[in-house]
Swiss-Prot record:
Main function: Fluoride-specific ion channel. Important for reducing fluoride concentration in the cell, thus reducing its toxicity.
Entry protein name: Fluoride-specific ion channel FluC 2
Gene giving rise to this polypeptide: fluC2
Protein activity control: Na(+) is not transported, but it plays an essential structural role and its presence is essential for fluoride channel function.
GO terms classed as biological process: cellular detoxification of fluoride
Organism of origin: Cutibacterium acnes (strain DSM 16379 / KPA171202) (Propionibacterium acnes)
Reactions the enzyme catalyzes: fluoride(in) = fluoride(out)
Length: 123
């Protein structure tokens, strides 16, 4: 049954990513794809919160960890799209822009995950 919930949550995460990415990229015209950056950082924060809540047993059911963490966050965030968009930014805007985009996303994602773990531990 858990696998079914992971699949359903993953589908919801993918739809949420599509809608949010479309909305962000239609509103902001920047040289790098802002939508994927925002989504991956948000997903890192959310996964940190989920992980901390599950590890600390803060009223968070272990049955929700896989569907929300692996399913929703896995469907919501996207490493492959980020990789392609970074390569396109490097090709279209220069290697420096591509490298900054890549490093910025990685650093922001890790910091967001740390923040999520910290916040989730205090709830």
């Amino acid at each position: 049954m858990t696998m079914l919930w992971v699949c359903l949550a993953g589908g919801l995460g993918a739809v949420a990513r599509f809608l949010l990415d479309s909305r962000i990229n239609s509103r902001f015209s920047v040289p790098v794809p802002l939508g994927t950056l925002v989504i991956n950082v948000m997903g890192s924060l959310l996964l940190g919160l989920i992980t901390a809540a599950a590890l600390n047993h803060l009223g968070f059911s272990q049955n929700l960890k896989e569907p929300l963490g692996t399913g929703f966050c896995g469907g919501f965030t996207t490493f492959s799209t980020a990789s392609v968009e970074t390569a396109r930014a490097a090709y279209g805007c220069g290697r420096r822009v591509g490298a900054l985009h890549c490093m910025g996303m990685a650093i922001a994602g890790v910091l967001a995950a740390i923040l999520g773990l910290a916040l989730g531990s205090r709830v």
